[in-house]
């Protein structure tokens, strides 16, 4: 009887260990990225693929309203946030830049949408840098702005710290590793948070990347962000080396966009960014 009880205890312990290892090595990326499967309507956006490290990286492209002659005078490279597909925001991004003759390219990470590969955090840095390089090769003399929201700002800053981007638009940026440890560690005694944070690539260290970015930047900050608390946004802003402005979305949360009440202020900030774009 006692031997049978011990066997059951060992089976339970083994099951817990396997579940823990599954969380660390398999589910960690899913917990952070939460990729959305299936078809997503992209509206009027057109699909393009960039070849990055021999694999197809899917982008959804829109022309701004100001782009009337078909020749873009600049490009915007947008990286999606958590649980977001490029198809869902492509038209929104294009409309944001309506006053500038640009094309906006919104990237689906590897393993998301029509992009090849696996949805892993380790695949984001090479994909983000490869997307910039592929776009720059198409238009070597045109400025490229990087833009992102939330999780996507880690990819945008990864690129901005390593390439000659013209400028950045960062909505609710976060230092991902610190956020995971601080915000999620306490309730699981860091048994889950620490391994998940450990899997965040060093190339996605937003504080280090911000300190090595000289391009001008517009920060968009939700005043009442209760998901990624404003103190995390402030860490990135404080670390940012380049000239920057901050647009505060009053009474807005993490999932809120720029509304009519702040649209004019955003356009003023984009005009400043366009006028002060870093030259290659």
List PLM regions with ranges.
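Short beta-strand/loop motif that positions the catalytic acidic residue
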Residues: 212-214, 218-225
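Short alpha-helix in the alpha/beta-hydrolase fold that links the catalytic acid
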Residues: 92, 205-206, 215, 229-238
